[in-house]
Design a protein with these regions (language model features):
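Sec-dependent N-terminal signal peptides
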Residues: 3-13
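Conserved hydrophobic beta-strand positions in leucine-rich repeat
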Residues: 36-40, 61-63, 81-86, 104-109, ...
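LRR N-terminal entry segment and analogous cap-like coil->beta motifs
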Residues: 29-69
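The feature encodes a structural signal of leucine-rich repeats
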Residues: 26, 48-51, 71-74, 94-97, ...
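Boundary at the C-terminal end of the N-terminal hydrophobic targeting segment
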Residues: 14-18
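Leucine-rich solenoid repeat scaffolds
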Residues: 113-164
């Protein structure tokens, strides 16, 4: 009976933690198994934090408005990730290994330096939202991806040299 009570309390606690956005890496690292949502926007990051591998339950990751230049080829450990916001960074390319993020539903690449998407992005089985506004691709490429990814809400526009 005690075990059952403990198990139910633990599940209730973990379920309650799913709605919490951690906004500080040190705080998140203090309890990595309870990190479901991590928001590190406007932190001046130049790269994906290597500590991401310590969050096995991570579902939502917001790295927007940083200076990240490269999308690592080694995010396959984030199998529970459903939401990834990389908008307003300096990412130049997306690796084919993005197809390993099989739970990904929402991908925001708005305002990056990407000039092409890997074909494998169309293999994400749960993707239903893709924002590639401001990505430098030809109109033909936009059409190709839109055709390959029917059922995905596509947000796209030509890039601009806008000043904030």
């Amino acid at each position: 009976m005690r075990f059952l009570t403990f198990f139910l309390l633990l599940n209730t606690f973990l379920f309650a933690q799913e709605g919490v956005w951690y906004k500080d890496m040190d705080h998140a690292l203090a309890n990595p198994d309870s990190v479901f949502q991590l928001q590190l926007k406007r932190k001046g990051l130049n790269a994906f934090p290597s500590e991401l591998s310590q969050f096995p339950n991570l579902q939502k990751l917001d790295l927007s408005k940083n200076k990240i230049g490269a999308f690592p080829d080694s995010l396959n450990h984030l199998i529970n990730l459903t939401f990834l916001d990389l908008s307003r960074n300096k990412i130049a390319s997306i690796p084919a290994s993005i197809s390993q993020l099989i739970s990904l539903e929402h991908l925001d690449l708005w305002h990056n330096d990407v000039d092409a998407l890997p074909y494998q992005i169309s293999e994400l089985p749960n993707l239903n939202y893709l924002d590639i506004r401001g990505v430098s691709m030809s109109h033909g490429d936009y059409g190709k991806y839109k055709e390959l990814m029917k059922g995905v809400d596509f947000y796209m526009s030509a890039p601009c040299d806008c000043q904030d």
